[in-house]
Amino acid sequence: MPGQIPLIGEKLPEMVVHTDHGPKKLPDDYKGKWLVIFSHPADFTPVCTTEFVAFAKRYEDFKKLNTELLGLSVDNSFSHIKWKEWIKEKLNVEIPFPIIADPLGQVATKLGMLHPEGGVVTVRAVFIVDPEGKVRAILYYPLNVGRNIDEILRLLKALQVTDKLGRATPANWPCNEIVKDHVIVPPASTEQEAKERLQKYECFDWWFCHEKAPAEDVEEAKKFLERPAKELCK
């Protein structure tokens, strides 16, 4: 049976995992960094191969956000190594990040990553873990749909901005249809604060106020928007 999924805001379960880069202690080995853990159904499968190539091509973007990548599947380390070699030889892409080898599904069980009807098969899950080891975001994709790496980067950047500013980001940030690249100010908690904020911020009403985000954060976030079809579909 699949394990209980760690909830947003909870600590990532402590465990030692085995990867093709050697053992890793989670979350301690990544303390001070953001971590994206993502599971895939199996090595040597077409959709998973496209995902790993996509993650590898954006690896430097993740590094700029102080973020490490960590893959996971129920394959063993030998399979991971051979798959990476195949990707390098056939597609000329180096996979620079480690992959957890979890042939018994023990790690996937702890993280709730097993497909409920697929036996020991990992789903396409994404966990974003902050520098303190807390789970901050969780994404799940069906087996027949590959992940969008641009959106994972945008989500990661938005989490970092909201932590820094104590604000929230609107839909489609940093290009929202209503407030553009601004961030949302949390609602007032007193009548006096509600009156004051109408003079302090740009507001549609006292409960809907917004302000500019730092320009450098906005520009970086825009790089992680889904790239136009003209660029992606060349």
UniProtKB/Swiss-Prot annotation:
It is found in: Cytoplasm. InterPro entries: AhpC/TSA, Peroxiredoxin, Peroxiredoxin_AhpC-typ, Peroxiredoxin_C, Peroxiredoxin_TDXH, PRX_1cys, Thioredoxin-like_sf, Thioredoxin_domain. The keyword Oxidoreductase applies. The active site is at residue 48. Transmembrane segments: none annotated. Residues 6-161 form the Thioredoxin domain. Homodecamer. Pentamer of dimers that assemble into a ring structure. The active site is a conserved redox-active cysteine residue, the peroxidatic cysteine (C(P)), which makes the nucleophilic attack on the peroxide substrate. The peroxide oxidizes the C(P)-SH to cysteine sulfenic acid (C(P)-SOH), which then reacts with another cysteine residue, the resolving cysteine (C(R)), to form a disulfide bridge. The disulfide is subsequently reduced by an appropriate electron donor to complete the catalytic cycle. This is Peroxiredoxin. The lineage of its organism: Archaea, Thermoproteota, Thermoprotei, Desulfurococcales, Desulfurococcaceae.
